[in-house]
């Protein structure tokens, strides 16, 4: 809660609309509080650390309450935030829930709602006898950790390069634009697979691959906004005062091009989630045995040819779809609010 309030107060100093400042402040807090340790610190240490991240639960609830107060007039935004906060809350609370071991074989191909060997399988079990409910809830944590982290890294790199190219111009702009145009010449999935084949399959390499495929798009957006903003009076006033170019880019340019970037960030989270899930489905992403939605879809696809086992595919597919829908609806809601403000 203190971190959320601190982020909120910092963002208000940039004269953001109150609703946008509160929302972004909560999102920044959520990026760091509840999710980072599980995969980034390694499976055993990360899972142990996730049990002490109890402050993440009130952080998610605080974000949702702030959104309720600020976005009451936007039904689309509230639906999107509800979906996102639901999965964030699941990701934070899953260590405390009385779930079965997601990797333990119990009874194969048990139908949803069936009790077998004294165990209730709410959403059934897969071909290896593992509980689908447990794997779905634990899997959302991996997807959110890597999706948020990859998008954050891509935005840091892309926005930094875009500000440098747009503000400084000259050979800086030519060099950055050339590299980005080369990367953009590859189809996204082809570039991701190529990088992972060269570097190997690991979580860190996924971050590199997603950054290389996403940062050029962000760079072009930020560069265009910076080219327009650097001609404004407030930038020229900062130049007259003798401010350092880095200070001008971070304090004058970046806050004043925030609107399109916030909307794009929400959409980019959805794109990154699709990319990571697809890579896992193709066997190029996060590796088993830990649960992941893309891996669950891959394992459930053959069994789903028979309708009685289609739940193995439907459950993770609906989970991915609902999370992506939440990001997209939130982006639409922020766009509506920005237009009103």
Regions found by a protein language model. Give the residues of each.
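Hydrophobic alpha-helical transmembrane segments of membrane transport/permease proteins
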Residues: 78-82, 90-125, 282-291
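Glycine-rich helix-loop "coupling/hinge" segments at transmembrane-helix boundaries
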Residues: 184, 196-198, 210-211, 224-226, ...
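C-terminal transmembrane helix and the adjacent membrane-cytosol boundary/short C-terminal tail
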Residues: 199, 210-213, 259, 263-269, ...
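Generic alpha-helical transmembrane segments of integral inner-membrane proteins
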Residues: 82-93, 148, 152-160, 164, ...
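Periplasmic/extracellular loop-to-transmembrane helix junction in inner-membrane transport proteins
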Residues: 6-20, 30-51, 67-70, 99-150, ...
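Transmembrane helix boundary and interhelical loop/hinge segments in multi-pass membrane proteins
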Residues: 171, 225-234, 334, 340-341
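Generic hydrophobic transmembrane alpha-helix motif, especially the helices
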Residues: 14-51, 57, 61, 76, ...
